[in-house]
């Protein structure tokens, strides 16, 4: 049973193509190393071997200008290259902890591996895009050769695709490519190879009716009965009218039987089709599961039965399987927010209507989970560790009746998708069979009946089929001739007497890399990946991860330490570095795992880049992203001051009024490393500043250089102005998937209820306020804070002229402290009370992440500022009586970093007494 003390979460994040298995990770990292080492890059990469990488490394090792550390790193890369099998295959084993450690070490080495900028300045590598280009070129060549009946050269092209190291990333494409090879082998009269390739196509896509058809044709001479079984399977699985008629004709023209073809169709429909059981068997796999064993027994028994016997015994076996399911319901109850491990699946069979298969949880790994719906079964399969640790999903797929797919919610998406996923999946479930005789009316894509009504619909269809049997039989001969003419493009091999020139589009992958949209590959991945050790890849795929942990708000407060707080800040900084904005960050979405590590979940309103809908895969880009968790320089000793985090955030103020923010991602030891050595151009942000600051490189020396207490407050405000000016840069940010596009005027209307005499009044329905009280000294509890239940006192209440809003100056009662808390409504607040001699400067950061806007609250002794961060501008912010320039929301993590840096620079240390007193007992 699932441990009730652990919390299991699933949330959605729509992403683009990503790498997912450990061999591909190493392959990717080696490409990065190769890119850094390559000084003669010509736009082409050899994707089949890395022999030239050894030569590059050897030339660098012999170069006296490189340090011993770099040479040692190069030898490490060379060892990895020589020891690892770099080409991903479908039979690789699940990576163990040793491989994970190796990959993490590899990342650290690459981050510290520096060469001259000239070595890589012209290198613009996009692995997936390059892969697509290569496959497209090979596919085009293969088609041209096929048109010219040059089958030998066409075979060479598709064999190159077959040998590609990326070939295991899409089983849909493997199945298609194998089918092409089978056709070409048959053209070259190589029967064994044709059989082998067509069988491989069947294996990689169990629902590929055409693969079954070709395989049946190829083995007809050697094994007639098996060939007929495969031809019949292709006939049953086909949903298109013309192809179905053709497959039916092929099958019954070869089978010696007195039963008419359409009578056979009627019997197959009465079975509800055994394909439902086949699908379930494929997804369950050969485990010790009771249901799986029952299905296997059924499959063994029906192997040598006639179709009539199969239909007769089907209901008995369905009853047996349902009885097993009823028994399992008493031992385990599945919910949409819980997973099971492999061991738990074996010991506790599951509900057939909610199959959730966590393929790797027994290894204690986090990774990708793919979910799909086949018939009445919702299938969730987890695959190896991905770069997107901490990002999870429950979105299901709903067919819209076209080639596009919509992403439903976790609450009702599964129910909506149970019947809709049938027409494209060829799964031959109840609703799909209803449509077999109705495709001319286009009913196959409008199957909105619930599963509870499928049996009734099947009975109705059976009656219709009975009534139409005679007519269908009378027209059978006519249809046979027509189907031959209409389906010339679907024939394939050997002694086929149809015109081979008309076979091109259906037989070969006609520009499939250009024409296949996201939906085609996505649904096939859900259907095909039935073996946990076989890992596929999708485009704009749904990503999930199982996270074992406890919500921050429910975590034992006595166990909260400074390390947890620091890890959270670092985690948020990493999100900022990779430009990911959470937009719904609160205590329930921050999990603390058993080992004390943090994981932030619920990225349901985040998005990376554009909202791509049905883009050709040649237009999609790769995203290589990971949280770099190796922070060797941070010592989490509780006595140490929390300031090492700024090894990764260097803030330099100089006399030239240029503010340089260097996110030092490529070195974890030297906070003052040369920013020019950073290969990431986005890591250096240079913007104008109005600061008249001291040229010293850090805020600490800057603040110490001011002795006049009367100017301290103004100086601190100027520093904050400089920091805010960094945020007014013209860059892309993440937007909610379902957010509407608002112009400035519409945004104003959304945030503010109305405009009265140049005053903006808040729209209470869309913009929550900070809690406040009119009575002086009345304590206010700012919600259930995860780290501190802080009582605050409202010192004053001032009305700020537009575009400011009513806010109150808040002061934490008690000692000087740095307080971090998260409000229930998704607001992050960092409150930094800082004493500088006799003056106070209270800084508060409060972005409202779940809306289209944010706001930055700045509280001082004399003035209060509430700056809407909902609009876009290229100007500077001025904290005076003039209206503050509005700008669009940026990642809230930056505000956190700036507030922390401000605190560090002005006070020379973090003030963390409450954490030590309350949490480190």
UniProtKB/Swiss-Prot annotation:
Residues 334-628 are annotated as: Kinase-like. Residues 401-499, 664-711 are annotated as: Disordered. Pfam families: ABC1. It comes from the Eukaryota. Residues 401-494 have a biased composition (Low complexity). The kinase-like region is slightly similar to the kinase domain but does not correspond to a canonical kinase domain and is predicted to be catalytically inactive. This is Putative uncharacterized protein DDB_G0278921. It comes from Dictyostelium discoideum.
């Amino acid at each position: 049973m699932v441990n009730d003390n652990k919390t299991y979460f699933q949330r959605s994040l729509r992403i683009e193509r990503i790498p997912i298995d450990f061999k591909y990770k190493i392959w990717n990292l080696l490409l990065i190393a190769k890119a850094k080492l390559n000084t003669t890059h010509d736009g082409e990469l050899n994707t089949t071997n890395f022999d030239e990488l050894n030569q590059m490394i050897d030339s660098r090792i012999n170069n006296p200008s490189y340090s011993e550390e770099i040479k040692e790193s190069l030898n490490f890369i060379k060892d990895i290259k020589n020891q690892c099998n770099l080409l991903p295959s479908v039979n690789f084993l699940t990576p163990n902890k040793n491989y994970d450690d190796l990959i993490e070490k590899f990342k650290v080495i690459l981050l510290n591996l520096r060469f001259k900028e000239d070595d890589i300045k012209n290198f613009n590598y996009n692995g997936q895009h390059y892969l697509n280009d290569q496959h497209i070129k090979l596919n085009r060549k293969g088609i041209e050769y096929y048109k010219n009946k040059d089958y030998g050269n066409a075979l060479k092209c598709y064999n190159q695709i077959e040998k590609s190291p990326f070939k295991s990333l899409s089983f849909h494409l493997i199945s298609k490519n194998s089918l092409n090879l089978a056709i070409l082998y048959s053209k070259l009269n190589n029967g064994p190879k044709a059989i082998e390739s067509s069988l491989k196509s069947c294996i990689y896509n169990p629902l590929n009716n055409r693969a079954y058809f070709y395989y049946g044709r190829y083995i007809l001479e050697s094994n007639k009965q098996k060939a007929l079984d495969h031809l019949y399977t292709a006939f049953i699985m086909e949903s298109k009218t013309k192809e179905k008629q053709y497959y039916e004709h092929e099958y019954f023209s070869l089978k010696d039987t007195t039963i008419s073809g359409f009578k056979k169709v009627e019997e197959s429909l009465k079975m509800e089709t055994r394909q439902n059981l086949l699908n379930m068997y494929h997804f369950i796999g050969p485990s010790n599961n009771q249901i799986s064993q029952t299905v296997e027994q059924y499959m063994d028994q029906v192997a040598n039965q006639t179709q009539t016997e199969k239909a007769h015994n089907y209901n008995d076996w369905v009853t047996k399987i349902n009885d097993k399911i009823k028994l399992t319901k008493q031992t385990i109850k599945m919910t949409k927010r819980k997973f099971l491990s492999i061991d738990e699946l074996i010991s506790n069979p599951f509900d057939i209507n909610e199959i959730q298969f966590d393929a790797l949880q027994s290894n204690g790994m986090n990774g990708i989970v793919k979910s799909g719906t086949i018939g009445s079964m919702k299938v969730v399969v987890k695959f190896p560790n991905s770069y997107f640790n901490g990002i999870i999903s429950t979105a299901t797929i709903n067919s819209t009746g076209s080639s596009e797919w919509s992403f439903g919610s976790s609450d009702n998406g599964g129910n909506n998708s149970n019947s809709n996923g049938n027409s494209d999946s060829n799964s031959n479930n109840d609703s799909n069979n209803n449509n077999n005789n109705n495709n001319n009316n286009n009913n196959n894509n409008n199957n909105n009946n619930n599963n509870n009504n499928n049996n009734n619909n099947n009975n109705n269809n059976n009656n219709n089929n009975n009534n139409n049997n005679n007519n269908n039989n009378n027209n059978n001969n006519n249809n046979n001739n027509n189907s031959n003419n209409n389906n010339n493009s679907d024939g394939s091999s050997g002694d086929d007497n149809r015109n081979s020139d008309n076979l091109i589009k259906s037989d070969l992958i006609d520009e499939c890399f250009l024409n296949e949209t996201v939906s085609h590959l996505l649904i096939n991945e859900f259907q095909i990946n039935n073996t946990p050790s076989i890992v596929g890849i999708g485009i704009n795929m749904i990503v999930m991860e199982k996270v074992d942990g406890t919500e921050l708000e429910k975590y034992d407060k006595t166990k909260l330490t400074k390390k947890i707080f620091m890890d959270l800040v670092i985690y948020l900084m990493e999100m900022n570095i990779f430009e990911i904005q959470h937009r719904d960050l609160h205590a329930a979405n921050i999990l603390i795992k058993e080992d004390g590590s943090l994981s932030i979940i619920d990225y349901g309103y985040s998005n990376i880049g554009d909202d791509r809908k049905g883009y050709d895969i040649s237009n999609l880009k790769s995203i290589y992203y990971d949280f770099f968790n190796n922070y060797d320089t941070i010592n989490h000793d509780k006595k140490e001051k929390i300031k090492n985090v700024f090894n990764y955030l260097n803030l330099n103020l100089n006399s030239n009024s240029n503010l340089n923010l260097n996110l030092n991602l490529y070195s974890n030891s030297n906070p003052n490393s040369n920013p020019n050595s950073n290969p990431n151009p986005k890591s250096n942000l240079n913007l104008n500043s109005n600061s008249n600051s001291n040229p010293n490189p850090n805020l600490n020396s800057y603040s110490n250089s001011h002795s006049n207490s009367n100017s301290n407050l103004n100086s601190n405000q100027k520093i904050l102005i400089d920091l805010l000016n960094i945020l007014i840069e013209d860059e892309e940010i993440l937007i909610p998937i379902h957010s509407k596009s608002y112009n400035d005027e519409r945004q104003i209307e959304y945030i503010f209820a109305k405009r009265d005499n140049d005053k903006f009044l808040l729209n209470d329905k869309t913009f929550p306020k900070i809690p406040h009280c009119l009575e002086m000294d009345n304590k206010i509890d700012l919600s259930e804070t995860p780290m501190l239940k802080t009582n605050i006192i409202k010192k004053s209440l001032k009305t700020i002229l537009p575009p400011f809003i009513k806010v109150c100056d808040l002061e934490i009662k008690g000692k000087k402290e740095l307080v971090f808390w998260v409000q229930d409504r998704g607001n992050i607040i960092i409150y930094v009370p800082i004493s500088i001699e006799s003056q106070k400067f209270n800084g508060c950061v409060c972005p409202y992440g779940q809306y289209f806007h944010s706001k930055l609250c700045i509280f001082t002794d004399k003035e209060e500022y509430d700056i809407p961060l909902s609009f876009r501008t290229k100007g500077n912010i001025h904290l005076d009586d003039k209206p503050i320039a509005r700008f669009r929301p940026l990642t809230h993590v930056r505000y956190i970093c700036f507030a922390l840096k401000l605190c560090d620079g002005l006070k020379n240390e973090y003030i963390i007494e409450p954490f030590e007193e309350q949490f480190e007992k």
